[in-house]
């Protein structure tokens, strides 16, 4: 029976795992949970592991290993011979099979009925269920777990080892290629439901033949009980001549598996877990060199660890050198042409490509220095280093596009037409570009503005149809620099980030010092002024000082939460009429009160910073008055685009204030510049002149204020 007072949990462990720490994990389940539910909860336990990233619910299965028996052998000598042969095969297999299985026997030679333990003769990582030889033909689960036979011995046929089905690789462990045939069961005492307590039915009769009498290994009493359990749905997969896998179906109830294998709830120890079989193995062999495509090949961590154990010769050619650990999201794939890679000889025949794969920045610098030293030798062929970014797709055909020429026409100049120039400038990398050692190493991804500047540079101006410059084919000459015409647009492509980002004032409300440093460093880099606040109340006080256009508000703040701080700011804006269209008289009165000196006429943009993806948190942030929200960790490249967007929105909403700021700057320059004062003939001429100022200039709205007074 199952103990209802205990938590229902089952121990699971990953089979054939390359991790050094592979401990059993307890997974709780209910009476209606199936094997699929156990898989989902097991994935939740390992949500942050690499094993979880490469596996899914359809690629794993729950089961265990079981031994194969020769049921036709009745004498003891033959049984011992078969056991020894299977034991020797298991030990000889080594890590090829990598059997990491359940252990339910104390001795593999003559275990007693119902005993569980580990076979001493087996390897530490190869534990196979061992049970006594049955005296009659029974089902596979009975042989593996000493379970009760479901049918009579005359109707139950053993599953031949040579006909053990193999699972389909397209749908691994999710379907049943071959199952044991379903048969009718004897009308014996059984469980009518998954309740921990058995129920008797009127149609059940306690009648069992002597051949089917069975003493349960989980029953501590000594009397015989003809108790039969519900048959389990499972498939088998042959591992070797002595062992096969038992894989439970996804729709099988977990409670039926537990009481069939372990009996009462809580009787399964952590040393006897069920196994998680996976068809995606973390340990993969390095593919042969002759079938390896360097452009599309990205080494895995296991391949790199295997290469570390082997001696590495940096001077060898045509050998892959995986010298450093490279993880996803780090340095891109770097491919280097070998020391003696002569792509096109003097006779015109192409030689085989020789290359080295480099993933270490220091080794890349050494290779660059070697190429630089070889330049002094005039007879050595020209070398190059090709840097490929992570995720690069496509081939690199060196035969159709030779990098260097060694013939006599090396220094001859050819004419490049305007159409060819467009093709060359549109490509991400120039074939005739010089080697730049300063740019070798880990490079940051370019922003959109930088990428546009790289595509069209001042050295490649816009040409008319009458201008056809001449260029050199030399590898180490500057591209497009020979006899080029004067640049018709000298300052067209000298844009910087200072002109891209709007002039806004930002308030960072964050209690985390690390997040403050990251955002502050980003804003300082782009010349954006900002202030810091550690809690919501401090943010409200700083906002009341005025001059802010954008607020990054963290929702989880001490003293006053981000949501409450946003509500107070919006309420204060309503009380002061910020964001409400007013007439000229009202704006004139506000200017006299001095309110517009501190606050702009546009409401501040509040962006919520949240670490949760919950729609409820985002909804609360928007209802509190936030204009937008960002989920941590914030992508800085994406943040730069959003700052430009929010700054443009603020400029469009409060266009008069932005124009007023530009006019203040202009008036300040005019006041500081030395000019001869002109005395007006009429004392009211200044007022008349100011009244004729166009109405679209907000600086002249108040005719009683001079330009110097407005500046103050």
From Swiss-Prot:
GO terms for cellular component: cytoplasm. This is Osmolarity two-component system protein SSK1. Signal peptide: none annotated. It comes from the Eukaryota. GO terms for biological process: cellular hyperosmotic response; cellular response to acidic pH; osmosensory signaling via phosphorelay pathway; regulation of actin cytoskeleton organization; regulation of p38MAPK cascade. Its main location: cytoplasm. The modification Phosphoserine is found at residues 110, 195, 327, 351, 368, 380, 673, 703, 706. Disulfide bonds: none annotated. The modification 4-aspartylphosphate is found at residue 554. InterPro entries: CheY-like_superfamily, Sig_transdc_resp-reg_receiver.
């Amino acid at each position: 029976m199952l103990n209802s007072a205990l938590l229902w949990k089952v121990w699971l462990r990953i089979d054939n795992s390359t991790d050094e720490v592979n401990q059993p994990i307890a997974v709780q389940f209910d009476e209606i949970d199936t094997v699929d539910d156990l898989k989902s909860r097991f994935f939740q336990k390992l949500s942050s592991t690499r094993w979880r990233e490469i596996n899914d619910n359809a690629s794993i299965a729950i089961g265990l290993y079981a031994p194969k028996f020769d049921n036709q052998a009745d004498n003891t000598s033959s049984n011992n011979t078969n056991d020894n042969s299977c034991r020797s095969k298991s030990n000889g297999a080594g890590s090829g099979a990598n059997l990491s299985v359940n252990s339910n026997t104390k001795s593999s030679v003559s275990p007693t009925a119902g005993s569980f333990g580990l076979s001493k003769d087996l390897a530490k990582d190869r534990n196979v269920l061992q049970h006594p030889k049955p005296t009659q033909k029974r089902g596979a689960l009975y042989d593996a777990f000493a379970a009760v036979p479901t049918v009579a011995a005359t109707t139950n046929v053993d599953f031949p080892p040579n006909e053990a089905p193999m699972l389909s690789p397209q749908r691994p462990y999710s379907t049943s290629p071959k199952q044991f045939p379903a048969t009718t069961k004897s009308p014996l005492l059984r469980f009518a439901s998954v309740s921990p307590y058995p129920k008797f039915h009127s149609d059940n009769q306690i009648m069992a033949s002597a051949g089917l009498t069975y003493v349960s290994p989980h029953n501590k009493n000594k009397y015989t009980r003809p108790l039969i359990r519900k048959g389990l749905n499972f498939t088998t997969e042959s591992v070797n001549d002595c062992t096969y896998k038992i894989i439970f179906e996804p729709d099988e109830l977990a409670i039926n598996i537990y009481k069939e294998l372990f009996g009462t709830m809580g009787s399964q120890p952590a040393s006897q877990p069920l196994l998680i079989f996976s068809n995606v193995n973390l340990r993969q062999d390095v593919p042969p060199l002759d079938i390896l495509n360097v452009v599309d090949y990205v080494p895995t961590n296991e391949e790199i660890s295997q290469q570390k154990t082997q001696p590495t010769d940096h001077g060898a050619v045509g050998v892959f050198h995986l010298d450093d650990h490279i993880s996803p999201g780090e340095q891109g794939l770097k491919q280097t042409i070998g020391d003696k890679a002569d792509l096109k000889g003097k006779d015109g025949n192409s030689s085989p490509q020789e290359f080295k794969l480099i993933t270490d920045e220091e080794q890349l610098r050494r290779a660059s220095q070697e190429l630089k030293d070889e330049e002094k030798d005039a007879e050595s062929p020209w070398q190059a280093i090709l840097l490929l970014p992570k995720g690069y797709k496509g081939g690199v055909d060196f035969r159709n596009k030779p990098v260097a020429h060694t013939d006599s026409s090396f220094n001859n100049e050819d004419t490049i037409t305007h159409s060819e120039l467009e093709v060359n400038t549109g490509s991400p990398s120039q074939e005739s570009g010089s080697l730049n050692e300063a740019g070798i190493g880990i490079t940051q991804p370019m922003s959109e503005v930088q990428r546009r500047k790289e595509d069209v540079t001042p050295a490649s101006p816009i040409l008319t149809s009458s201008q056809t410059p001449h260029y050199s084919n030399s590898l180490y000459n500057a591209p497009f620099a020979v006899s080029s015409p004067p640049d018709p647009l000298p300052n067209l492509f000298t844009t910087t980030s200072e002109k891209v980002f709007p002039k806004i004032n930002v308030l960072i409300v964050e209690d985390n010092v690390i997040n403050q440093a990251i955002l502050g460093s980003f804003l300082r880099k782009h010349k954006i002024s900002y202030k810091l606040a550690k809690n919501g109340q401090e943010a409200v006080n700083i906002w009341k000082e005025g001059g802010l256009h954008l607020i990054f508000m963290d929702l989880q703040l001490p003293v006053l939460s981000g949501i409450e701080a946003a509500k107070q700011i919006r309420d204060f804006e309503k009380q002061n009429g910020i964001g409400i269209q007013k007439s000229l008289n009202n704006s004139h009165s506000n200017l006299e009160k001095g309110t517009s000196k501190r606050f702009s006429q546009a409401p501040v943009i509040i962006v919520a910073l949240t670490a949760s993806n919950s729609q409820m948190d985002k909804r609360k942030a928007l209802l509190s008055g936030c204009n937008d929200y960002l989920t941590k960790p914030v992508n800085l490249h994406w943040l730069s685009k959003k700052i430009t967007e929010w700054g443009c929105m603020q400029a469009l909403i409060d266009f008069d204030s932005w124009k007023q700021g530009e006019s203040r700057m202009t008036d300040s320059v005019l006041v500081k510049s030395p000019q001869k004062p002109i005395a007006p003939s009429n004392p009211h001429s200044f007022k008349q002149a100011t009244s004729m100022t166009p109405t679209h200039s907000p600086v002249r709205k108040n005719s009683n204020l001079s330009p110097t007074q407005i500046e103050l």
